[in-house]
Amino acid sequence: MNINIVTIGKLKEKYLKQGIEEYKKRLSAYAKIDIIELPDEKAPENLSDQDMKIVKDKEGERILAKISPDTHVIALAIEGKMKTSEELADTIDKLATYGKSKITFVIGGSLGLSDAVMKRADEKLSFSKMTFPHQLMRLILVEQIYRAFRINRGEPYHK
């Protein structure tokens, strides 16, 4: 299985990079995983609704350019469906069963995802009703993908 994580913004925090690299290494036994970092759109602090839409649309264009037509897209969004780790594992397992060998997870920037990206998404996933920094979500997502593969293989994992 090929898994891409398309995300806005560069990861600067060393501790997050180390955590992500550790889970990518662990995941290499199960799947090929790539993280595609795209530049965030520079914007002042106090944006109007129209300016926010413009920023999200520009970031959205960059995201969509990195999504191949044959991939199953899962957008991380607060309004998405919440799943347990077992349900995420089941989603990944079913996609593999039905011949979907490519999954792309999308993490937006600080303003979220554009309407165009949300329309392209095959499903929307929420980890919580709380808002998390998009940099931290990368680590949480990679850990949950690793956990999903462990669950699907019947291997032990921490509950």
From Swiss-Prot:
Query: Where does the record place a coiled coil?
Result: none
Broad class of the protein's primary localization? cytoplasm
Per the record, its GO cellular-component terms are: cytoplasm
Which Pfam families does UniProt cross-reference here? Answer: SPOUT_MTase (PF02590)
Top-level taxon in the UniProt lineage = Bacteria
Q: What keywords is this UniProt entry annotated with?
A: Cytoplasm, Methyltransferase, rRNA processing, S-adenosyl-L-methionine, Transferase
- What CDD domains does the record point to? RlmH-like (cd18081)
Q: Where in the cell is it found?
A: Cytoplasm
Chain sites annotated for binding S-adenosyl-L-methionine: 76, 108, 127-132
Tell me, what is one Gene Ontology molecular-function annotation carried by this entry? rRNA (pseudouridine-N3-)-methyltransferase activity
Query: Its Enzyme Commission number?
Result: 2.1.1.177
Query: Could you tell me what reaction this enzyme catalyses?
Result: pseudouridine(1915) in 23S rRNA + S-adenosyl-L-methionine = N(3)-methylpseudouridine(1915) in 23S rRNA + S-adenosyl-L-homocysteine + H(+)
**Enzyme class, UniProt record, top EC level:** transferase
Record keywords: Transmembrane included?
A: no
Q: Which InterPro entries match?
A: Alpha/beta_knot_MTases, RlmH-like, tRNA_m1G_MTases_N
Entry function: Specifically methylates the pseudouridine at position 1915 (m3Psi1915) in 23S rRNA.
State how it assembles.
Homodimer.
Spell out the family assignment given in the record's similarity comment. Answer: Belongs to the RNA methyltransferase RlmH family.
Tell me what this protein is called. Answer: Ribosomal RNA large subunit methyltransferase H
UniProt organism field: Bacillus velezensis (strain DSM 23117 / BGSC 10A6 / LMG 26770 / FZB42)
- Gene name, per UniProt, is rlmH
